[in-house]
Structure formats: structure tokens, C-alpha cells
Swiss-Prot record:
It catalyses: phosphonate(out) + ATP + H2O = phosphonate(in) + ADP + phosphate + H(+). Gene3D superfamilies: P-loop containing nucleotide triphosphate hydrolases (3.40.50.300). It comes from Escherichia coli (strain UTI89 / UPEC). This is Phosphonates import ATP-binding protein PhnC. Residues 5-253 form the ABC transporter domain. The complex is composed of two ATP-binding proteins (PhnC), two transmembrane proteins (PhnE) and a solute-binding protein (PhnD).
Length: 262
């Protein structure tokens, strides 16, 4: 099976606090993987390293590959980082869309990496590109909102627009950081259904950070759980049982309660 993401000996320190400890991880083509863990476990930090949004410590032997290209090595970004980013879609908790633009215009932003520079200066997109953007919006159930401003949409609708933008980008990997954290249950279900549909029917690899274990169990075949910057569990979601859940979350809560009591 083709390895899409490879992480070796990744460490990260913030202000003398070590957020990640020599993490090793391989993610294969077509997987939908949940990164789980309590707040401060390192899951979002790990996700942001995968495409070089942040760099790791200058540890000997640390290395990250994405789509067969080096992203960073020993704390330094690769010179051709844009080539791997060009096929990587991002979905963030805070949506990361341009509120003053329409839904369609936001989706067309996904085509910038494959559009000649002179056309991007004038926001000129071809008829074929606009048609593809509308198809992407149809895919996520948002085509009827194409000409509305993004600022008029709900949080769940904005996340679906972000997914459509990744489709427009022709992403081979989608990295989603807490995409349902601020959504109501119905909106969260629709967003996760959309990600799973893209994963299963398009073969796009999806890595998603989640707080909600029930969503990870329902939508992802594989769970990678982090605890205090270490990989605590990496395996089939169906084997992530109550004992592992208790050790991952409740032991952390007890430490926090004891600290408050002191």
C-alpha cells in the first residue's frame, strides 16, 4: 500500500514545553484517520507539521514526507514545499474563508495553484474552472448558495464550502483540524458524512483531528491517539475500547483536578 504521509522522529518544543516526543507515523493511500487526544495532547500540532505550516525541532533524523516529497527535515522546510502543498487541502475549525467573497469565488481560490499568475492578478477564471467549482459545490450540497457571500452562511455550511475548495484544488490529501468542534450535532454529521464520501468514492486520504471519540469510531477505520505528545494508540478504531478511552482521557482529567486542588 502506498505511503502518503511519513513521519519519523518528529519532536516539537514550545517555550521549553515539549509538545511532541519523537513521533513516528505512516498514513497510507485512501485511509481516513482520526487524530484523537485531550486538549494539549499534540494532535493539532502534529497535523500542522504534516504540510509544513510549522516546523519541528532540529532533531537528528527527524523527517516528514507528504505525497512522496520531503516537507521538512531536521526542522527545515524543503525548498519545493509548494509542490506538496499544491495537492493538500486544509480545513480548519475557524473555516479560513474570505467573508467578503461569494461562495463560488471562495471555491475558485482552490484553483489558484494551477492558474497562470497574470490571470490570478485579475481574478480571471475560465468557464471550465467555474464549471468545476459549481460541480464541487454540487458534490457538497452547496450549489444553491454559490452567489451568496460566505459571511451569510452557518458554520457547517462554511465547512462544506472549504471541502468544495479542496475538491477544486484537486487535493490528494485533506488535513482537517477540528472541523466540527464548533458545530451543532446535525451540522457535524453532515460535514463528517461529506468527508467520508470523498474518502470512499474519490480515494482521497483524510486526516482529521477530533475531540469526539464517537465520531472517530463511526467515521474512521483507524485512530491515532496522542497523550502528552506521545503516540498512545495507533490501530483499528474498533479496538479502541473503554479501557483505552479511560486511560487516554480520564487519567488526564484526574491530573488536572489534583493540580487545581493543590
Amino acid at each position: 500500500m502506498q505511503t502518503i504521509i511519513r513521519v519519523e522522529k518528529l519532536a516539537k518544543t514550545f517555550n521549553q514545553h515539549q509538545a511532541l516526543h519523537a513521533v513516528d507515523l505512516n498514513i497510507h493511500h485512501g485511509e481516513m484517520v482520526a487524530l484523537l487526544g485531550p486538549s494539549g495532547s499534540g494532535k493539532s500540532t502534529l497535523l500542522r507539521h504534516l504540510s509544513g505550516l510549522i516546523t519541528g525541532d532540529k532533531s537528528v533524523g527527524s523527517h516528514i514526507e507528504l505525497l512522496g516529497r520531503t516537507v521538512q527535515r531536521e526542522g527545515r522546510l524543503a525548498r519545493d514545499i509548494r509542490k506538496s502543498r499544491a495537492h493538500t487541502g486544509y480545513i480548519f475549525q475557524q473555516f479560513n474563508l474570505v467573508n467578503r467573497l461569494s461562495v463560488l469565488e471562495n471555491v475558485l481560490i482552490g484553483a489558484l495553484g494551477s492558474t497562470p499568475f497574470w490571470r490570478t492578478c485579475f481574478s480571471y477564471f475560465t468557464r471550465e474552472q467555474k464549471q468545476r467549482a459549481l460541480q464541487a459545490l454540487t458534490r457538497v450540497g452547496m450549489v444553491h448558495f454559490a452567489h451568496q457571500r460566505v459571511s451569510t452562511l452557518s458554520g457547517g455550511q462554511q465547512q462544506r464550502v472549504a471541502i468544495a475548495r479542496a475538491l477544486m484544488q484537486q487535493a490528494k490529501v485533506i488535513l482537517a483540524d477540528e472541523p466540527i468542534a464548533s458545530l451543532d450535532p446535525e451540522s457535524a454529521r453532515i460535514v463528517m458524512d461529506t468527508l467520508r464520501d470523498i474518502n470512499q468514492n474519490d480515494g482521497i486520504t483524510v486526516v482529521v483531528t477530533l475531540h469526539q471519540v464517537d465520531y472517530a469510531l463511526r467515521y474512521c477505520e483507524r485512530i491515532v491517539a496522542l497523550r502528552q505528545g506521545h503516540v498512545f494508540y495507533d490501530g483499528c478504531s474498533q479496538q479502541f475500547d473503554n479501557e483505552r478511552f479511560d486511560h487516554l482521557y480520564r487519567s488526564i482529567n484526574r491530573v488536572e483536578e489534583n493540580a487545581k486542588a493543590a
